[in-house]
């Protein structure tokens, strides 16, 4: 019995959000003694204020996140979570033309796959409930990480329980506890205390950026009959060039909406209630008063915080065998690809695959051998994951431009149509849109970028070939028989010749 206890590792997880909670489930399933420390109170308590100071943020759960949750081997958990989601099969673009409101659907995937809108609290509560039922997991809320020694494997937490009196003769300091561990996982968000203390030991390259965009949350209420006011199976976008308004469905038949705009535009909107209403009418047609009344719009804009958007990159994601950081603590990304949550959950799957591969959970190994194996696993994780998280960071920035402007351009629609047609009709090519690769596969993010660039070069070659061939065919026909072809006949002949060229080119690619 003593030998069994000796072989168990002790893991400290900092942060009880979805990513930290999933990490705890993975470790507990492998026999670790797990302790989770969370700065805030119990996240299942509605009175607990989230770190972003809002209470109803919706998340997009796609293939990467679902796969990571399935690998926890808690089928009931993932099934319960998915039952509470709303599938979104594509974007619904809104606009106005000559005074008439219009909307146009753009499917995410030619095969009908969808991403899932899920309430943050629904996901987090399900994970925490599962952890509470796991015997080798302990939850500690209202605990702030104040220090760590990653050579001695010790950490210190202040216990900030509401109503708890300071200890006698403590100069009113809150109680502090010392915790020993074998390794720590830092999953405490973009302003991570775990990362801060790790940087005292590791040489971390760190890049943080605030883009000139603020966001504010709004709500479209259900109809008087308790139904959705607009299609629930789409992510609704009102693109506005420099800004945009989006809406995601919620389980209570409302929509959680977000206004993204530069700080200067927020200042203009806040200068008078009339500016806010008029701006929405001009730039986001059909929102006010059709979906949100002017009074509600003004109240929500005044009440809800106007928050910045942060992105960060860092390397490495670990120090020796003592600590590894995951999720936003390692790679906060902008929300415009819906991959922040999914990338964080995928971190956990990839991390524990490396831990398993390198023998960190080999119970026959000595503690020193397991530490050495864990150090190798952490290094392999950093080597792979830094490249991928930097890639999704860049993709998320690029997608902001696409969402607020590109979705309406003919070039975007043309490329999307061509790529989807190739995916549907010539599957042997392995052709997919970049969005499908990101959202509906587990392909590494860095490889997604490489695939998208290759496809872009092929499409560019195809376009150039088409233009050159068109000119060549027309010149040939006029040179051979300048008077024997009507314009209609010339076009039909040119189309047959060009079609044969395209078929030949893609057949060559398919069988290469």
Curated annotation (Swiss-Prot):
**Which InterPro entries would you find in this protein's record?**
FAD-bd, FAD/NAD-bd_sf, Kynurenine_monooxygenase
Pathway membership = Cofactor biosynthesis; NAD(+) biosynthesis; quinolinate from L-kynurenine: step 1/3
In terms of superkingdom, the source organism counts as Eukaryota
Principal subcellular localization: mitochondrion
Q: Which GO terms describe its cellular component?
A: mitochondrial outer membrane
The prosthetic group or cofactor this protein requires is: FAD
**Organism of provenance:** Neosartorya fischeri (strain ATCC 1020 / DSM 3700 / CBS 544.65 / FGSC A1164 / JCM 1740 / NRRL 181 / WB 181) (Aspergillus fischerianus)
Q: Which GO BP annotation is one of this protein's?
A: kynurenine metabolic process
List UniProt keywords, sorted A-Z: FAD, Flavoprotein, Membrane, Mitochondrion, Mitochondrion outer membrane, Monooxygenase, NADP, Oxidoreductase, Pyridine nucleotide biosynthesis
Q: Could you identify this protein by its name?
A: Kynurenine 3-monooxygenase
One Gene Ontology term of the molecular function aspect = FAD binding
Q: Which compartments is it annotated to reside in?
A: Mitochondrion outer membrane
Catalytic activity line of the entry: L-kynurenine + NADPH + O2 + H(+) = 3-hydroxy-L-kynurenine + NADP(+) + H2O
């Amino acid at each position: 019995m003593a030998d069994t206890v000796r072989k168990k590792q002790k893991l400290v997880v900092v942060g009880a959000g979805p990513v930290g909670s999933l990490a705890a489930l993975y470790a507990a399933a492998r026999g670790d003694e797990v302790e989770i420390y969370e700065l805030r109170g119990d996240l299942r308590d509605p009175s607990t204020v989230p770190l972003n100071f809002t209470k109803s943020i919706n998340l997009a759960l796609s293939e990467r996140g679902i796969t990571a949750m399935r690998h926890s081997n808690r089928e009931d958990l993932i099934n319960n979570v998915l039952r509470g989601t709303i599938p979104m099969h594509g974007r619904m673009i809104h606009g106005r033309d000559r005074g008439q409101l219009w909307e146009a659907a753009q499917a995410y995937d030619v095969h009908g796959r969808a991403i899932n809108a899920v309430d943050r609290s629904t996901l987090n509560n399900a994970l925490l409930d599962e952890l509470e039922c796991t015997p080798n997991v302990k939850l500690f809320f209202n605990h702030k990480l104040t220090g760590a020694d990653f050579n001695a494997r010790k950490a210190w937490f202040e216990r900030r329980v509401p109503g708890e009196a300071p200890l006698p003769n403590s100069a009113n300091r809150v109680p502090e506890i010392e915790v020993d561990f074998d390794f720590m996982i830092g999953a405490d968000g973009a302003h991570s205390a775990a990362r801060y203390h790790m940087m005292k030991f590791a040489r971390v390259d760190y890049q943080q950026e605030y883009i000139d965009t603020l966001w504010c949350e709004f709500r479209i209420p259900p109809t008087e009959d308790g139904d959705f006011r607009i299609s629930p199976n789409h992510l609704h976008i009102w693109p506005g060039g420099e800004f945009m308004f989006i809406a995601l469905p919620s389980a209570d038949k409302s929509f959680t909406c977000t206004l993204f705009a530069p700080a200067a535009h927020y200042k203009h909107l806040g200068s008078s209630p009339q500016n806010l209403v008029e701006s929405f009418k001009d730039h986001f047609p059909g929102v006010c008063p059709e979906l949100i009344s002017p009074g509600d719009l003004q109240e929500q804009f005044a009440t809800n915080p106007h928050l910045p958007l942060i992105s960060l990159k860092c390397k490495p994601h670990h120090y020796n065998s003592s600590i590894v950081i995951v999720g936003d603590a390692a790679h906060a990304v902008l929300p415009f690809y819906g991959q922040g949550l999914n990338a964080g959950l995928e971190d956990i799957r990839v991390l524990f695959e490396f831990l398993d591969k390198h023998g960190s959970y080999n119970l026959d190994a000595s503690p020193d051998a397991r530490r050495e194996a864990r150090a190798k696993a952490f290094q392999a994780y950093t080597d792979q994951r830094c490249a991928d998280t930097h890639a999704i960071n860049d993709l998320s920035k690029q997608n902001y431009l696409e969402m607020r402007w590109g979705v309406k351009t003919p070039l975007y629609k043309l490329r999307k149509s061509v790529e989807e047609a190739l995916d549907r009709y010539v599957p042997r090519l392995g052709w997919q849109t970049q969005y499908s690769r990101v959202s509906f596969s587990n392909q590494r993010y860095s490889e997604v970028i490489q695939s998208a660039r290759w496809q872009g070069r092929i499409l560019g070659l195809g376009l150039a070939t088409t233009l050159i061939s068109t000119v060549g065919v027309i010149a040939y026909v006029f040179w051979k028989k300048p008077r024997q072809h009507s314009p209609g006949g010339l076009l039909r002949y040119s189309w047959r010749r060009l079609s044969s060229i395209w078929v030949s080119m893609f057949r060559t690619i398919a069988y290469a």
